[in-house]
Amino acid sequence: MVIAIDGPSASGKSSIAKALGMRLGFKFISSGYFYRIITLIAQRFSLNEYDLLSESKILELVSQNDIKFNGFDFLLNGTNVISHILNERIDFQVSLYSSYIGVRNIVNKKLREIVKLKDDNYIIEGRDITTVVFPEAEVKIYLDASVKVRALRRYNQRSDNVTLNELEQALERRDEIDQNKEYGKLKLDKEVFYIDTSYKCLDDVCNIIIKTFNLKKKVIER
């Protein structure tokens, strides 16, 4: 079974998906980590961190590197790179590289292969997960929150010197990019269960999703 969790950046997708995985015994995958690894590959190649590589160059570089999810960690050429992809430098470019159709096709293919090859239960989170990657998911959730709340959450997670105002502006830019992508844009699927997480704690959101999951499970098992 697949529980697909969609929504904008910092809406709580990763934290809630991880907590749900623990409570339900499902494996957790974040599509965003794949895009962040691809952005890391680009930044390691580029002499200037602000340069944006072409789609053809990105696809060439990705083909020369090995990106894997082993069930627990995200690996680049056999090395766990989680500590290298959760920072402002990656934040700055990840939405731009993830807008490339070729890049999205690679990530979507990897996600589908993981689910297909391993007969297991998954919670998969990311933008366009409910609309493009797993439109057939048994449970589809869309998490949302105001920009101010999302910026504050991101601010509390960070250890660098970025300001709250800078994070709010960055999220607004990212929302605009994600909502206007040619392919895989952020949007509400008509079958999703919408949850505004702005003023809900993690446990409350998890309880809502588990209730939805249990109702769906009963329907499937009839």
From Swiss-Prot:
Keywords of this entry: ATP-binding, Cytoplasm, Kinase, Nucleotide-binding, Transferase
Disulfide partners: none
Q: What class of enzyme is it?
A: transferase
The GO annotation for biological process reads: pyrimidine nucleotide metabolic process
Q: Where in the cell is it found?
A: Cytoplasm
Q: Quick one: where is this thing mainly located?
A: cytoplasm
Gene3D superfamilies, sorted: P-loop containing nucleotide triphosphate hydrolases
Summarize where ATP binds, as residue positions.
Answer: 7-15
Q: Known catalysed reaction(s)?
A: CMP + ATP = CDP + ADP; dCMP + ATP = dCDP + ADP
Molecular functions per Gene Ontology: ATP binding; CMP kinase activity; dCMP kinase activity
Give the CC-aspect GO terms: cytoplasm
Q: Which InterPro entries match?
A: Cytidylate_kin (IPR003136), Cytidylate_kinase_dom (IPR011994), P-loop_NTPase (IPR027417)
Taxonomically, the superkingdom here is Bacteria
Q: What is its EC number?
A: 2.7.4.25
Q: Could you say which protein family the record assigns here?
A: Belongs to the cytidylate kinase family. Type 1 subfamily.
Q: What is this protein called?
A: Cytidylate kinase
Species this protein is from: Borrelia turicatae (strain 91E135)
Instruction: Give the lineage.
Output: Bacteria, Pseudomonadati, Spirochaetota, Spirochaetia, Spirochaetales
Gene name, Swiss-Prot/TrEMBL: cmk
